[in-house]
Curated annotation (Swiss-Prot):
Its main location: other. It comes from the Eukaryota. Disruption phenotype: Mutants swimming speed is reduced compared to wild-type with trajectories wavy and kinky. Cilia length is not affected. The lineage of its organism: Eukaryota, Sar, Alveolata, Ciliophora, Intramacronucleata. One of its GO terms (biological process) is cilium assembly. This is Cilia- and flagella-associated protein 263. In complex with CFAP263, acts as a regulator of ciliary beating that connects radial spoke 3 (RS3) to the inner dynein arm (IDA) and the nexin-dynein regulatory complex (N-DRC). The complex is positioned parallel to N-DRC and forms a connection between the arch at the base of RS3, the IDA tail and N-DRC. Forms a complex with CFAP184; the interaction is required for functional activity in cilia. Keywords: Cell projection, Cilium biogenesis/degradation, Coiled coil.
Amino acid sequence: MNQDKHPEITDEEQELITVEELSQKLELLYKDMEQIRRENLLFEAYLARNRKEIAKEDEVSEDKKGKGKKKDKNVDKKSLLLTNEEKFEIAQQEQDALKKQIDDGRIKSDQILETLRAILEETDMAITEIRKDAFDFQREILVGGENSRTGKIEAEKIIKFFEEKERQKDALIAKYSSKRTNLERQILKTNNQIQKKEEMGDDLKFIDFYQLQIENKKYVKEIDDKNKKLLALKISTNRISQTLKDEKQNLKQELDKGKEYASQMSERKKKISKIDAQIKSVKKVTSKLEKDRKIYDKQKEIFVQDNQDDVPQIMKYVQYKSKEQQLLYAIQNLERKIEIAELAYKKANRILQSSQQFQQK
């Protein structure tokens, strides 16, 4: 009969419809289970937070029951269920508790952040102080404390430097001690005022609170201005440190160049002294040859005078001519060497003078 009434729906379509309905019901069940799970978590948190109060209420209720245990068995299960108003109240209490925890956590995190900022600021100040001390030590001891005669650092300057630093530290300690004493006095005075107001029951009036707000804004503005100045000083210090580093590098390069020029000058001086020795040696040889030439010229004149009337022998004449040619050739070679040595000497003198001028600059 059903097939006659609904001929268009087959058995397979009917099964598909049934499966779809079951899937929808299952999805609704999952949603209900998720809601119940969240409610249970909320109630567990409420019980954990109010466990002591609930235990006291249970003890009081058990004392009141007394002999009515049989009646309790017949209590309707509906009385054990929470109403929507009770659920709302529990949820509201848990929300307030969670909000309070968040506020407390925010306050603690702000306190920790302020502490970390103070530590960071103190660390930056310490780093700046260390850099300044290192710069002063390098300027006054490593550079200015070197003895020009021995090339070593004088111990007296080191002792004087550290004594001066110790005096500065003592003065700083005294300054901070005085500041700490003043702050302790102010804290003690403020605590006494607060205690007096608490004893008198005098609360802060609106105008006092407004005045405190104005002062707080003023101090916050001053702190911001000082922080900006401190940041600018830090940037300037970093820039100066970088410039100093670059200048040190340039100074090192110039010193290396100076050492190289000094080495070149030493080598050139050695060459000049060697050339001077060669020139002296050549001059001695030249002088000797000149003497020999003069002697030869005299001998030649004597020979010519003695043999003006005689015919000279051919072999002696050839020997004299050969010896004369050798002497002339030796003289020419020596004169050429003298010219070369003089040119080298002049060149070396020019190089030495230019090196001395560069060293004076």
